């Protein structure tokens, strides 16, 4: 099954209500061709897979058991933190992640301390966190960081040169004569990591007296991240459709980037500024900032009613 949590009314998700049978919960971050998901299905667990590639999601949808596996098209670190309660995941798997070898990209690696804290917070006590990689240095760094964090201990470390599961990258690296390094970590200590998203979702919107103000396209840096705003589209019904890309950069080198469309349309009290009806996005703090920004500009500050707060920081760079 394909899950679109952007439209849900509360976080984290109730996974027991999503799956038809109540089983232990396993999560894979970056499932590629879906072969490892199929392996997990045979273990009697409910499986959740995260992937940022639409093509990978489409391929996996054709092979998974839709009663046992749920797929999400989104960043797995963000999803693990926002969609799961603390101590709710029984096992976490990361297969052949990008190693990000350059020092300037170190924060993007998946075994930094802030990310390890997220893993430890969502995993049940004594659960396993498993990594497979073809990069020895990456495996060693994962072990070192995990043990130094005090959150995980090393349960197993194995090296092989044959295909076991048949994932795309496993087959590729083995065919090139590379070794595969398998690291199994066990949760040692719990740590609490709060969600970024509000537990109860509100639909951000504003009512303005008029919409004749000037909308300034460009890049805005707010308290919560970055907003890239483009010129609006308009029609003869006095409606505006305003495209933007919104990034919430709240933590650990991973930002949630969303393509957002804001509509401005006539309302009995003037005009209403809100997410377009077809906008399938998380209502993050920076999406709320976007609503305030547009409402403030098109009304020349004459906002009649709004259910979000202005960002405490707002810097503008023209397009």
From Swiss-Prot:
Gene Ontology molecular-function annotations: tRNA (guanine(46)-N7)-methyltransferase activity
Domain of life (superkingdom): Bacteria
Pathway(s) the chain acts in: tRNA modification; N(7)-methylguanine-tRNA biosynthesis
Residue numbers binding S-adenosyl-L-methionine: 28, 51, 75
Gene Ontology cellular component terms for the protein in this record: tRNA methyltransferase complex
Family indicated by similarity: Belongs to the class I-like SAM-binding methyltransferase superfamily. TrmB family.
Protein name: tRNA (guanine-N(7)-)-methyltransferase
Gene name for this UniProt entry: trmB
